[in-house]
Amino acid sequence: MNVGKKSEIQVSAKSNLNFLNELIEEKKRYEDEKRKISHQKYTDKLLEANDNETTKRKLLVKQKRKSNKEFQSNIIKKRKDEERKGTLKTEQANEEELLQRSRLELERKAKKYDQYAAGELEIKETEDDGILVDFTRKWAEEAPENETVEITDEFGRTRSVSIYETGNTLLSQKEEYKPEKPIYGDYMPSFEVDEEKVQKLWKEDEQQAVHYDSTKEVRNKGTAFYQFSFDEKEREEQLLSLKEIHAKVTQQQRKNTEDVLTLRDKKLEERRKFLERDYAIKLGERWMSEHFSNN
């Protein structure tokens, strides 16, 4: 046996064929996988491109609609501005035309009046009515047909009557009025004041002034503000009702306070008992440790 030579591996032809078949199948599998991955990537790119295209198309449609709305609104606004400007121009033109005609007419009349004043022209009878102003006729034309005034009749009522009826109404009142006790000559009337009546009136005023009236003041009222009635009977009923409500609220508050204090005392007592028991246990343990640990 020659040790220096390398040993060769004997491989059969069948094994080579099997290996080649497996290699070809593996290569084919690899190519198929690669082709599937490439196809999937290509499909994803196409879908992404379609999505982007759809999004772009939607954005373009949205922008186009927005621009169309803005364009239409601008057209409507521009049309309204033009109509308003045209209306203003027409009104200004009409006013200017009216002013121009009035100015020309006044200038013509002024020139004609100057000629009449200088004696260059004579006033004809046919022109008399058109030149001179008839102030009587002007006042009659401007005055209302049936002007009314306010008067107070014999019953104390304020009435609106025609100006032509005012004289008769006031005249009848003047004739009907006759004083009961006329005073003639140098005479100073005296008046005796009834003290009892005055005192009674003062007491009534003071009694009424005791009660506060919130309607006489202009100010902001609080949430719990309460206006009592000025009727004494109703006022007493309101006071009694408020006193009953106050008593109920006070009793409920006192009860709640007592319940809270009772609960607090109960908790303090339980805590005290717990501490005493705990202290007794610790004291017993310490006594036991001191006496039995030495033994």
UniProtKB/Swiss-Prot annotation:
Positions of the UniProt region annotated as Disordered: 57-94
Residue ranges that the Swiss-Prot or TrEMBL entry lists as coiled coil: 87-116, 259-286
Biased composition (Basic residues): 57-67
GO terms, biological process: lncRNA processing; nuclear mRNA surveillance of spliceosomal pre-mRNA splicing
Key word Coiled coil present: yes
Keywords: Coiled coil, Nucleus
Location in the cell: Nucleus
Biased composition annotated in UniProt, kind: Basic and acidic residues: 79-88
Domain of life: Eukaryota
Gene Ontology cellular component annotations, sorted alphabetically: nucleus
Listed PANTHER family: COILED-COIL DOMAIN-CONTAINING PROTEIN 174 (PTHR15885:SF1)
Name assigned to this protein: Uncharacterized protein C140.04
